[in-house]
Amino acid sequence: MSEVTTAEFNEEGKYLRKIRSFVLREGRLTKGQAQAIETQWPTMGLDYSPAPLDLADVFGRKADTVLEIGFGMGASLVQMAQEAPELNFIGIEVHKPGVGSCLSDAAAAGVTNLRVYHHDAMEVLEHAIADGSLTRVQLFFPDPWHKKRHHKRRIVQAEFAELIRRKLKIGGVFHMATDWENYSEHMLEVMNVASGYKNQSADGTVVPRPDHRPLTKFEARGHRLGHGVWDLMFERIA
């Protein structure tokens, strides 16, 4: 965990690489988070290497694998892993306190089917995840880049959709969620023209929140205030 990369996007939506040496100033760790990283990383942490993971070796079994991009503090990811022990889960997060919090929660919950990267998701997907190996890819509440001039910096772009499609098995699902309606519309525009996908919504728009995605405290509060959340699920069909 000595170096972390972050992805940036230019105005055409192309990925740029910005490598920086990791320093603790980039995120203050609580004692609990630091201790969790120290004690749990050897068993749950995945050190980035530009070679495809052997998932059966990593998890000690063969099982369908779910990958989440940007899990934040990790509470929902840990809950999903706890509620679906038959699945393998991989989480990717560049924010170190989030990694520490996730590992702490996972250890407290006794979760054994979760592995975590502290690295840029684009590099992990491009180099460390084999094509056709994932059952589901999750992208929940990504940065909306709400200013119009920044929309092309949003992670959901045609190139990204194709990358996710390659990593999914046939029949695998790309599940997105956002609390910005404009971003949900952007996601639909991108995904509806992306080759090899089928929208799982009956009317070609969004889907109700599926049972596998936990309702977060933030989201529940938003519902009470009349705020919306939009879920999109696209199946790989080719």
From Swiss-Prot:
Physiological role: Catalyzes the formation of N(7)-methylguanine at position 46 (m7G46) in tRNA.
Single GO biological process annotation from the record: tRNA methylation
Enzyme kind, highest EC tier: transferase
Keyword list, A-Z: Methyltransferase, S-adenosyl-L-methionine, Transferase, tRNA processing
Pathway(s) where this gene product acts: tRNA modification; N(7)-methylguanine-tRNA biosynthesis
Catalyses which reaction(s): guanosine(46) in tRNA + S-adenosyl-L-methionine = N(7)-methylguanosine(46) in tRNA + S-adenosyl-L-homocysteine
Active-site residues annotated for this sequence: D143
Pfam family, one: Methyltransf_4
InterPro entries: SAM-dependent_MTases_sf (IPR029063), tRNA_(Gua-N-7)_MeTrfase_Trmb (IPR003358), tRNA_methyltr_TrmB_bact (IPR055361)
Enzyme Commission no: 2.1.1.33
GO molecular function: tRNA (guanine(46)-N7)-methyltransferase activity
UniProt: S-adenosyl-L-methionine binding residues: E68, E93, D120, D143
Protein name: tRNA (guanine-N(7)-)-methyltransferase
Gene name for this UniProt entry: trmB
Family classification: Belongs to the class I-like SAM-binding methyltransferase superfamily. TrmB family.
